[in-house]
Swiss-Prot record:
Keyword list, A-Z: Cell cycle, Cell division, Centromere, Chromosome, DNA-binding, Isopeptide bond, Kinetochore, Mitosis, Nucleus, Phosphoprotein, Ubl conjugation
Cross-link (Glycyl lysine isopeptide (Lys-Gly) (interchain with G-Cter in SUMO2)): 150, 182, 229, 240, 242, 266, 501, 640, 692, 770
Positions of post-translational Phosphoserine modification: 71, 94, 302, 344, 363, 404, 495, 505, 647, 673, 728, 737
Gene label: Cenpc
Start-end of Basic and acidic residues biased regions: 426-450, 496-512
A Gene Ontology molecular function term of the record: centromeric DNA binding
InterPro entries membership: CENP-C/Mif2/cnp3, CENP-C_mid, CENP-C_N_dom, Mif2/CENP-C_cupin, RmlC-like_jellyroll, RmlC_Cupin_sf
Protein known as: Centromere protein C
Broad class of where this protein is predominantly found: nucleus
Amino acid sequence: MASFHLDHLKNYHRRYCRSSRAPNIHTKKGQNMLEILQDCFEDQSKASFLDDFTESLTSSTQKKKANYSQSSSKKCPESHSKPVPVSSRTGEASLQASAEPSEAAGGSVQANEVHHGASDELDLCVGSPVVLLDANVNTLQKAASPAGQKRVASVSRSPVDRQASNKNISFKTRKRLNFEDKVTLSTAETENSVLQVEDNLSKGQEGTSSEITQKRDDLSSDVQSRSKKNFSELFLETVKRKSKSSSVVRHTAAVPFSPPPPSDMKLLEDEFIIDRSDRSFSSRLWVMIPSKDRHLSAHKPSPENTALLQGKKSREKSHSLSAMTFARNTQSDKAHPIEEAQLSVEENPATTCTDELENDCRSPENKMQSETAKTPPAWERTTKQSQRRVSKPKAAEELRKGQSSWENSNVSNTGQDKLQINSKRNMKDCEEVRNEPNPKKQKPALENKKKTNSTQTNKEKSGKKFFSGGSKNKFVPKKVTLTSRRSCRISQRPSEWWRVKSDESSVDRNPSKENNSPVVYPNKKKQTKRNHVSKRAGKKPGSSKRQKTEMSPRVQKSLNVKDSGGTVSGHDDTSRSQRKPLKIIEADPTQKSLAISRPKRGCKYRNNVMTSPNVHLKSHTEEYTSKTQMESASNSEMSKRSVWEESGPSRFKNYEMPGSSNSEMGDEQDQKSLHFTTRSFNMVPDKKLHHKLVLPSNSPNVRRSNRIRLKPLEYWRGERVDYQESSSGQLVLEIISPSSVPTKIKAQRNLGKVNKKVTKKPTHLNSHEKAKMELPLDMRLGDPFQATLAKDPETAELVPMDLIRPRDTYRFFVEQHGLKVFKTLDTIYFSTGKLVLGPYEEKGKQHVGQDILVFYVNFGDLLCTLHETPYKLTTGDSFYVPSGNHYNIKNLLNVESSLLFTQIKR
């Protein structure tokens, strides 16, 4: 009989498991799959096939003496795994780790028992390829007992099919077989399961303990927790019981068998595999018909993430998830398959919260899937021992809770879209909450940072805690509450960065006070940088990339995770690092710098006090208090010596400008003071000094330069700035400004040279012009170059004498350096002439003797010393030197000066 079914199965493969080049087979919605299968199974009808299957199932189950109930009392994390065909030649049994959809909190699922009879009527429908292939759910094998055959008239459909039908999701139907019964409600499944548990418990007491132990291992994988089975599974189980061979029939292309392909390897589109291994019933026959749908290996939501997402959905619906306390119960019928199978799927520790949220919000079918993870063999032994202690009311209660968890998992598409949008905003929130495995202990911020880097270790530890709790039949309630804000922007008071507090004692080091007082920063960039520095101090240096992502101040301010033991805030590390005040850098006594008082300035000076630029900023109230104290301290130390009176807008009254008046530090010698002193050859007015200095302007709330500026100095007069250092180490500024000589306004005069007439060209007048100017002369004129007849006084006779000396004719001429002496007339009684002095030339001191000298200043400014008295003479002045005296003449101009002299001889 088995060979007959295999032949028809080959025909089915040739007709429907076609290559990718064959056209697609389109089926209408609601069309019965039996109409299509009639061409495949020519002479075999559905009734005859099911009769054979029921017959074989009844014969195999009648050999067993008792039925046993299995229930899950252990929680375990589950993950998806792909079915991989394994040949018997390699000595490994083929296993398909099917994932069961569950609530985020994890609903408890009660295993149902196997009955002796088969269902009378089975309908086949086209199901979702995602549910039937990628999320191959474990189904509950139902065989009606003699007492309960009438109650089971049809196979109940699963909540996954019910959800798919309610949402009217159309899927691409391709070679997918499924049971269809869209009339039976989920409540009938619960009632039938409870009745079956009662019958099985009553019958299980009759069997011996040895048979119970032996049959439990054989039926651990056969008993399923769902109320339906795939057509391929029912068919292959029938073939399993008819033929006992350990060969593998592979109806596909002629290629050699290879090891199990990885999760990302693409198989043939229409590959059809039959595994008939008889190692144990746990590695049962299964058929894999892969499609081109994307693999779900990269989208494995973690149990923590699933719990968080379902918790958010329940808050949006205003429902309290009471079923979260019974999360992740391990199904008893899956214990043996997990023990023998070695799953190749490992949990990725680096899976980010974004991938998990995108995975869970992608489709309703992906939300309904649960995870299967690696479990050591000790877990299964503990599970088998705990299964023997399951009671009747416990099974009924878990069935009701499992049903309620399925009802809560039906979320509308609109809610899913909103959840997907909100999940992207709260990606950081999910990751930090996931790193807290124990809800009753408040973990410090540093410990939570370390657990972020070791996500995989935390998941395994949390999984072990859940399994150990399930073995003792204790359900530990775990309630996680998230308090997050949609808007991450937080309004802050406007920063007043120009206010600086110089008093070191005002920096409060009390952590309680510092936590309450806000820290004001100059701009937003500095605040982000300091947050990064504080976060790096509490984290390991290994994961720098993830630290930068988690250091965002928006996430730290918006996330507050509240546990039952306390509250953990993401802003805790930042506030702790900001509590440490910055060290005040004192001025170096060897470093010189110009400083002047700036009233009400916050950059470096305030009220004639020089402060350090690196001062820890405090709140506005403390700044105002410290400013008042600084003003009073600075006013008490002001000097009284006045240099400038009413000079400038600031009206400085101080001769010496003091440094920082820090009374507590008492280090006034280290602070440099600036002194303004003036030094002049003559007394310089105060306004003159103020005119040269440009002091800093008094402009509050505006950043200005604090240096002292000077107007251009008159360097050609010797005006300069002299910087000196006093004996006390203070810097002194000296301005050297010589007084200017006032110049006298002179009258405009013709200051021609003495020899100007000599060098001047004579003007020749016409005879006609001379006739008009001169009077007519009727006398005879003498010749000036000839001697003149004159009477001698001694003899009284006419004697020719030289009485006229024409121009440019001299009797005596002496030139020495810049001194020139011209004698025009020279007699025994007297002599006349002209004295010329060069620029700044001096004649020298000379004694007169018996003669008398008469001088007339023709041009220039002269310094004349008559005997012992000096005089300043100018053009037009006359003087004479009596006999027996001496005289001296000096030219005060840079030009030649001329004098006319007469010497009287005795």
